[in-house]
Amino acid sequence: MNELFSIAGKVAVITGAGGVLGGNIAQHFVQQGAKVVAIDIRQEQLDNRVAELKQYGQDVIGIIGDVLDIASLEKVAEEIVAQWGQIDILLNIAGGNMPGATLASAQTF
């Protein structure tokens, strides 16, 4: 991969990582050498995803977080900075791959 676009060593935070879409994105990031912070509201799905991701690389942590709760997100951010010092990439996938998560065309304007 072109070094200009390399994500190796970058800290990537992925909300909704316990789900299918977020989990697959997280897997790709780990395979590309990123340090991945998997965030989900569901403990069991998060634990399963982190175990799966660690098959591809050890720079993976899972943190329970609720994207609808500011205090929860502040705590998550503090944990990430304490662990890896920074956040380079943020992908907000939580809730986006659920029925009803899209807007009708009349709601977009």
Where in the sequence are the language-model features?
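Conserved glycine-rich Rossmann-like NAD(P)H-binding loop of the short-chain dehydrogenase/reductase
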Residues: 32-49
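Structural signature of the Rossmann-like NAD(P)-dependent dehydrogenase/reductase core
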Residues: 14-16, 92-95
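The beta1-alpha1 cofactor-binding region of Rossmann-like NAD(H)/NADP(H)-dependent oxidoreductases
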Residues: 43-44, 64-76
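A glycine-rich helix->loop->beta "capping" turn
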Residues: 7, 56-59, 79-92, 98
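Structural signal for short hydrophobic segments within the conserved structured cores
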Residues: 37, 60-63
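Short, conserved SAM-binding/catalytic segment
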Residues: 49-57
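Conserved mid-core segment of classical short-chain dehydrogenase/reductases
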Residues: 74, 97-109
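Canonical Rossmann dinucleotide-binding motif of NAD(H)/NADP(H)-dependent dehydrogenases/reductases
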Residues: 3-37
